[in-house]
């Protein structure tokens, strides 16, 4: 690749991720709801980011059964992709606005239950599910082991808890502090959390290798901040497909995200 093109791609990645040096301080001193890197994914959630949304779905979908509890549902855009294959869906959040909107969205739908849920906590749902999905949630919870134990209590024996978390403390920066991240995980630290909750592991690996490199560079420049929406399309069209192509043939040594499928004992 010509040097000029490399520099333009790097600049686009860094602009997408932002930096303390270039981005005004907007933090109001209060932790945001359990959105985590969902703040990034809010920018990657529209039509301009179809590749990224497909990346998430393709990673998670093979592990989703017929009944699903989603933790940290936001407005429900991710779980709605599974609606046609589920006979029971529980959506949840700990943000009052999100819970209100989810309640309105699913009013009158007897196959969907809406919960106001802040883990760790006792979970009361109509029946057990075969799958839990938590996208960018666990990193907000100090007692992450207990949170997984609470979730396991409402999963059928042999069921799965699908976990998507930000990876590697070397990537921890202003963004993480602003959104209330307690930590970023490595496969080793996430394994310790999952096994500490009494769960087995089917899948555990870092993903989004190129995104991890860009995030690291942004932190080195002064702290990863909020994404520049103008560059989301560039990221989606160039970085996401390239990352996916690499990860089809090579297991990356690290990544922006750590992905895990935990198994509830039979």
At which residue positions do the language-model features occur?
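Conserved N-terminal segment of class I S-adenosyl-L-methionine
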Residues: 2-135, 145-148, 229, 241, ...
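A short His-aromatic
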Residues: 136-140
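A short glycine-rich, Lys/Arg-flanked "PGG" loop and its adjoining helix->strand segment in the class I
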Residues: 145-160
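Short, glycine-/aromatic-enriched active-site segment of Class I SAM-dependent methyltransferases
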Residues: 161-183, 188-195
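Conserved S-adenosyl-L-methionine
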Residues: 199-210
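C-terminal helical/coil "lid" or tail adjacent to the Rossmann-like core of SAM-dependent
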Residues: 211-240
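Core SAM-dependent methyltransferase catalytic element
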Residues: 216-223, 253-266
């Amino acid at each position: 690749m010509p040097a000029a093109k490399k520099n333009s791609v790097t600049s686009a990645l860094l602009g997408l991720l932002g930096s303390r040096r270039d981005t005004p301080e907007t933090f109001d001193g209060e932790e945001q709801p359990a959105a985590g890197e969902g703040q990034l994914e809010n920018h990657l959630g529209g039509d301009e980011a179809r590749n990224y949304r497909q990346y998430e779905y393709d990673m998670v979908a093979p592990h989703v059964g017929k009944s699903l509890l989603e933790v940290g549902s936001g407005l429900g855009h991710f779980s709605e992709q599974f609606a046609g294959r589920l006979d029971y869906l529980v959506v949840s959040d700990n943000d009052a606005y999100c819970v209100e909107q989810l309640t309105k969205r699913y009013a009158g739908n007897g196959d969907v239950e809406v919960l106001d849920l802040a883990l760790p906590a006792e979970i009361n749902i109509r029946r057990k599910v075969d799958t839990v999905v938590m996208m960018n949630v666990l990193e907000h919870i100090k007692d992450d082991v207990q949170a997984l134990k609470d979730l396991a209590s409402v999963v059928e024996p042999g069921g799965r808890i699908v976990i998507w978390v930000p990876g590697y403390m070397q990537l921890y920066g202003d963004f993480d502090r602003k959104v209330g991240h307690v930590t970023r995980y490595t496969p080793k630290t996430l394994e310790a959390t999952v096994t500490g909750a009494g769960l087995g592991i089917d899948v555990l690996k870092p993903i989004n290798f190129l995104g991890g490199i860009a995030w690291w560079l942004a932190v080195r420049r002064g702290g990863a901040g909020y994404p520049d929406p103008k560059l989301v399309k560039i990221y989606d069209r160039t970085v996401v497909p390239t990352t996916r192509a690499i990860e089809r043939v090579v297991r990356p040594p690290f990544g922006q995200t750590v992905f895990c499928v935990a198994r509830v004992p039979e």
